[in-house]
Amino acid sequence: MAEEEPKKVTETVSEPTPTPEVPVEKPAAAADVAPQEKPVAPPPVLPSPAPAEEKQEDSKAIVPVVPKEVEEEKKEGSVNRDAVLARVETEKRMSLIKAWEEAEKCKVENKAEKKLSSIGSWENNKKAAVEAELKKMEEQLEKKKAEYVEQMKNKIAQIHKEAEEKRAMIEAKRGEEILKAEELAAKYRATGTAPKKLFGCM
């Protein structure tokens, strides 16, 4: 069992490691550990350090280049992220400002519409009141006009009546004077005397 274990160890160590120093030191440690532990445990333990060292050596060679790129990418990523966050904040702020502006405009429009509506109703009420007053005045004027027309008609009738009375008086007086003239003429004929006044009409 002990012979088989070192063989396995040497085989596994010789394959992955190119340098002779590493396999020489490791088998001794493996030989010390092997009798104490189970035979299955050593093989996975021994090959793992060699690749780790290779990886460390490889990483040591690559370390100066990779971190710079990563740092640059991180810087660029952080700058881009900051720019994106700033743009998002700006867009958010602009959208809030736009929403506020729209709300204020809507509020102003509603307020103006309300005032315009109240002015329109006020105008209509005032116009209706004035038109009602005008109609009332027209009715009063029509009533007064009818009264005045009636009064004028009465006056005209009175004037006509007075004129007729005057005409009748004149006609009566004329008839009386004609009778008087006829009587005097008959008297003058009977007496044979001439009238003192001739051509009284002239």
UniProtKB/Swiss-Prot annotation:
One cellular component term from this protein's GO annotations in UniProt: plastid
Coiled-coil features, chain-numbered ranges: 123-169
Annotated region (Disordered), positions in chain: 1-79
Biased composition (Basic and acidic residues): 1-10, 68-79
Induction info: Induced by mannitol and NaCl.
GO biological process terms, semicolon-separated: response to mannitol; response to salt stress
Low complexity compositional bias, start-end: 25-39
Key words, A-Z: Coiled coil
Compositionally biased spans, kind Pro residues: 40-50
Pfam families in alphabetical order: Remorin_C, Remorin_N
Protein family: Belongs to the remorin family.
Protein name, entry field: Remorin 1.4
Biological source species: Arabidopsis thaliana
Name of the encoding gene: REM1.4
